[in-house]
Each structure stands twice: as structure tokens, then as C-alpha cells.
């Protein structure tokens, strides 16, 4: 059964490594050393819920509800455009240190709300956990399925805590004005690229619904 664990771990790691809204947010919180371990835990727990739902039967709900998928997609587009705009606005600020200080004033609950948004309003999360993992893990018998799910969940916990701790460790180098400007530009551009990609997918979904 351990082979199913490592299959799940490898697949989970491959899907979580690319830079996306979750990773960017965890990295930034690590650099700021602001509730970064709490955010890593909440991201990992969110993945635990989504992965479990996808592998143990939740994928059928999403696949049978095209309107739900469309709603999640366009909600994600709107949020990613807003999030990317905020990052680019900070990067282009004439006083980046002041802009960064304003971000640091955010309270715990606002940070948690943002974390929930970057996780649960990201349609790619549902496609990864419900469609990809659900289709692969759903074909397995119950015992291998549990090991497969445990492997993917382990990859999520290891990645988010590793990313948060590494970003916090590198914080002295990554908190410079130049580094912060580069990071915010990178995050903003990536968020907008993902948003435009999702918008194209959303248009395709809407055309399929009305045809």
C-alpha cells in the first residue's frame, strides 16, 4: 500500500509546486513573518478537505454542475484581477516601504479572509482536487484510496509549512525595497495571467452551456 502513498505524494507535489495565488500568499506572509505558520496550517487544512472530497466522491458534484463550475470560475477571475492589481499597485508605489507598512497593519481576520479567498475562489484548486485527483483516486479500492489521499495531503502539509518557514528564513534578504518590488511585480503578473486564462476557460464554459 505504501506505493499508493508515494504515488499520491508525487502527484500532489507536482500539482502544488507551480506559483499560484495560494503559494504567493503563503510566501508573502512568510517574508513578513506575519501569522505565516497559521496561514500554512489553514492552507494545508483546506487542501485536506478539498482532496478528501475530490477523492472520496465530491468530484461527481462538480462534474454534474456546470453552472457551479462557471460561478466558481468567474468568481476566481474577479478575485485574481483584484489581488494582482493590489500587488502591482504596491510594486509601483513611490514609497514602497510605506505601502508595505500599510499591508503589515492588516489584522489576523483580514489575513484569514484573504487566505480563504485565494484558496476557495481559485477554480484550479477544484480542477486539481476534484477532477484530476478525483478521477485517479476514485478508481482505486477503498484501502489504496486512503493511502493515495494520505500521500497527496502529506505533500500539501510539507509544502506549505516548508514554503512559510523558508520565506521567513530568507526574510532579511527578501524584505529589501528592490526584492519587494520584484516579488510584487511577479505576483501581480502571474495573478493576471491566471485570471486571463481562467476567463478564456469561463467563456468556453458559458458557450458550452448555451449551445
Swiss-Prot record:
The gene is argO. GO terms for molecular function: L-arginine transmembrane transporter activity. Pfam families: LysE. It is found in: Cell inner membrane. The keyword Transport applies. Its main location: membrane. HAMAP family: ArgO. Involved in the export of arginine. Important to control the intracellular level of arginine and the correct balance between arginine and lysine. One of its GO terms (cellular component) is plasma membrane. It is a multi-pass membrane protein. This is Arginine exporter protein ArgO. InterPro entries: Arg_export_ArgO_enterobac, LeuE-type, Lys/arg_exporter. Belongs to the LysE/ArgO transporter (TC 2.A.75) family. The chain crosses the membrane at residues 1-21, 37-57, 68-88, 111-131, 147-167, 179-199. Keywords: Amino-acid transport, Cell inner membrane, Cell membrane, Membrane, Transmembrane, Transmembrane helix, Transport.
Amino acid at each position: 500500500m505504501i506505493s499508493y502513498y508515494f504515488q499520491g505524494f508525487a502527484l500532489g507535489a507536482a500539482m502544488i509546486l507551480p506559483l499560484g495565488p495560494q503559494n504567493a500568499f503563503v510566501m508573502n506572509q512568510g517574508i513578513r513573518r506575519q501569522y505565516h505558520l497559521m496561514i500554512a496550517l489553514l492552507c494545508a487544512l483546506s487542501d485536506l478537505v478539498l482532496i478528501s472530497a475530490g477523492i472520496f466522491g465530491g468530484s461527481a458534484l462538480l462534474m454534474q454542475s456546470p453552472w457551479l463550475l462557471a460561478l466558481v470560475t468567474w468568481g476566481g477571475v474577479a478575485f485574481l484581477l483584484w489581488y494582482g492589481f493590489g500587488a502591482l499597485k504596491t510594486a509601483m508605489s513611490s514609497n514602497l516601504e510605506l505601502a508595505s507598512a500599510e499591508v503589515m497593519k492588516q489584522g489576523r481576520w483580514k489575513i484569514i479572509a484573504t487566505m480563504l479567498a485565494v484558496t476557495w475562489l481559485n477554480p484550479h484548486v477544484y480542477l486539481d482536487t476534484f477532477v484530476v485527483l478525483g478521477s485517479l483516486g476514485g478508481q482505486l479500492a477503498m484501502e489504496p484510496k486512503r493511502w493515495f489521499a494520505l500521500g497527496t495531503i502529506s505533500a500539501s502539509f510539507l509544502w506549505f509549512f516548508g514554503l512559510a518557514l523558508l520565506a521567513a528564513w530568507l526574510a532579511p534578504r527578501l524584505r529589501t525595497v528592490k526584492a519587494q518590488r520584484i516579488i510584487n511585480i511577479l505576483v501581480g503578473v502571474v495573478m493576471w495571467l491566471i485570471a486571463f486564462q481562467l476567463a478564456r476557460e469561463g467563456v468556453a464554459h458559458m458557450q458550452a452551456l448555451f449551445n
